[in-house]
């Protein structure tokens, strides 16, 4: 068996609907690590918000966060690569965000800033994890009233990703068309009600290349698990792309394998157990 590395998306893949990995899967992955297989994560989440998962499974490699815009090493507690959104294009994005009055999040190299019309702080806290898969991390997650966005000095921050969230899923294609008018950005739908905005050419495969170039990761000896449209490029970059059965049609179309069970029923565990037995 030439499998040496496994990379996991988090939301909808390694994590159950309760936002934690299932125990049976965790124990199996720890056994694989003991056998020399390296494990890490590739997520749309900020590295700040990946940390909770790393308490269940310690990654052997830096994690690919913000859809590839920031690769972070938990061992050294330092970023090893950052590709931020160019400050020149942020005003155009800001204009769109303010015009359409949708909740949005600035992911930076140090914090996450949320801007929302939800004035009930308790409601904001409860929906952070349920809606956008965000862990409640004190001091690193700043919730602001929507109007505060006018005062946000983006030039003082290294912005790796902007997450746009709408309550109306049917509005996503319309919002995507507005983003098409802005040059030098890339966007993808990581959830049916959200759009992730990054610098042009940034995606999870971009983050993967950082590991290939700096950490002796061979794509021909690598498996990737994912479930969403933002996994397509990294699926196309490795030998064994695996989509969860609960994944999007586009993710499954670009996968070599599809799990029998979903993320709430140890889909990863059952797939790997069968795959490694052959």
Curated annotation (Swiss-Prot):
Disulfide bonds: none annotated. Phosphate binds at residues 10, 43-44, 204, 230. Keywords: Hydrolase, Magnesium, Metal-binding. It is an enzyme of class 3 (hydrolase). The keyword Iron does not apply. Its EC number is 3.1.3.-. This is Putative phosphatase MG265.
